[in-house]
Each structure stands twice: as structure tokens, then as C-alpha cells.
Amino acid sequence: MRSTIRALTSAVVLAAGTILTAAGPAHADVTICDQFGSTTIQGRYVVQNNRWGSSAAQCINVTSTGFRITTQQGSKPTNGAPLSYPSVFLGCHYTNCSPGSTLPMQVSRIRSAPSSITYRYVGGTFDAAYDIWLDPTPKTNGVNQMEIMIWFNRQGPIQPVGGVTGNTSIGGRSWQVWQGNNGSNNVISYVAPSPITSWSFSVLDFVNDVRARGLITTAWYLTSIQAGFEPWSGGVGLSVDTFSASVSG
């Protein structure tokens, strides 16, 4: 989320912890404390620490199927941006592309885009959310023009970018819809009324809803499917236990 701020944040190497700066494969549990450190799992997904909004320490333990936050020392005002977005993704994020990914792919070519996730929650102020990025060009670096967020959980007095525009039903679930702009890209957020811990769904259903609202066209490109947490405070123990995503044309 909020890619412009991420792009302007310089990398800070922590003095302690395992430092992973390249997206190398994770064969056993590894710890990432580097600000933008990442690694690959299952030979197809990238897990990233992505501590873009703070200089405070954050570490994640990466497993073969996901990750867990093990250190989180920062705190941010709840009326502003979060500390970070530790996450797992398929596709490309600032030139870091998952192995063998079919993304970017033009929306008109996409026939299926299934995804599934299992979250584990603890205390703190955070959201648990998918971050789905689209752009008019097949961009693999920089800020995309459209951000779709799917909030599976919201804890504390935090809210998405923009304001409420209504409610909708997607994938057999009800969602409160928010729309806005964070200064660099448009954002549409779908907020669940109560926490979701596990779900299998079609990313394409959300993309099609955004298209029906006139915010994108079928000529746009899906560039990445990401899932993780945005903590404002606390969060040690939050985890993505399992994640899967694929896009086929």
C-alpha cells in the first residue's frame, strides 16, 4: 500500500538478525529483518518484510507456506499510514518478480485467478489485507495506478483510504466499499464486517467489480496479488499460515 512512500523510503540495514536482501529460495525457516528483504517460497511466491513506513525494527519468520511477524517495535498514529506491509505475493513488486509468474497479464486475457489464504490473528492495531495492483501498462516497477485492497480483518480505530461509497456482495460475502486516492494512485477497499481467517476465492471477481465501476478497463494489466498485514502497533504473532494464487489466460 502507498507505494510512493515506499519508493521514497531508503533501505536501512539492521544490525541484528538475519539479513536477506535478494529473493533467494527459502528451503528452511529463515528470519528477515532487512527493511526490504525478501525470499521465495515454494519456488513461486515472494515473501517480503516491506517495512516501508518506519525505521523501527521489524522481523518476520518465513516458513515453507507463509510467514509470521516475530519482531515489531514501531508505532504509528491511527489517522495516518501504517508501519509496513509484510506480505507474500505472486507477480511483480518494484522489479522483484516471483519465479515463473504469468504477471503482468492483460485483464482481457485472464480466464481464472483463484487464491486462498489462512490468517492467524493476535492483538494489536492492524489490518489483514490483500493488495491487488493494476496498471494501464505491463509495469514491473514503480507505482501502479489502481490498488484493490480486500480487508479480511480490521483491529483498532483505523480505516481505508477515502470514504465509504456503499456495500456490495462478492464471492458470497458482504463488503463495505471505500474509494479514494492516496496521492499517487486510486484505491478501492472492500472491508469485511467481521474477521475472516480462511477463504478461497476468485481475485477476478474483485477485478471485475472494479471494472464495472468504471475504474479500469479490460485493457489494463494485473501486475501482482499480495497478502499480508498493515500494523500500526503490536502485531507480533500475526501470521499468514498458507497462501496460494495463480493467474491463467
Question: What residues fall within each predicted segment?
Answer:
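Long, compositionally biased interface segments
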Residues: 194-249
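N-terminal segment immediately downstream of the Sec signal-peptide cleavage site
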Residues: 29-80, 249
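Secretory targeting and sorting signals
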Residues: 1-28
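Ser/Thr- (and often Asn-) enriched beta-sheet segments in non-cytosolic proteins
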Residues: 31, 40, 66-70, 104, ...
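Short, surface-exposed beta-strand/loop "edge" segments at domain boundaries and coil↔beta transitions
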Residues: 74-85, 121-125, 139-143, 197-200, ...
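Extracellular-facing segments of soluble proteins and assemblies that are Gly/Ser/Thr-biased and enriched
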Residues: 84-165
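Short helix-loop boundary/capping segments
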Residues: 138-204
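Short, hydrophobic/proline-enriched secondary-structure or compact coil segments at domain edges
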Residues: 67-71, 111-118, 130-132, 222-231
